[in-house]
Amino acid sequence: MINPNCATISIYAGVGGEDAKDWVEMLLRMYQKYTQHNNWKVRSINDNTLEIIGENVYGLLKNESGVHRLIRISPFDAKKLRHTSFSLIEVLPELPESDARNLPIP
């Protein structure tokens, strides 16, 4: 059984170079502000991963998993052209500790 009150969110830059990295940073800030708004506890595990604890966190965030796209005029392009950037968001629940020696193998 999963713990619905704990989730780990990892965000990875996809295609888009500097714009994709900037998109990941924007998403991380957005999720951090969302956790503050909901009075959840958040802990940064590394540069692109957050552990969030609060009531029904996993239930509310699980649908955020997947590829997210941003289309904008790039601040990194001298020609001010429109660029598309992608990021991958992975939302995982906290799983209980288990002893692999006791797992039934069919």
Where are these regions (language model features)?
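A conserved glycine-rich
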Residues: 1-106
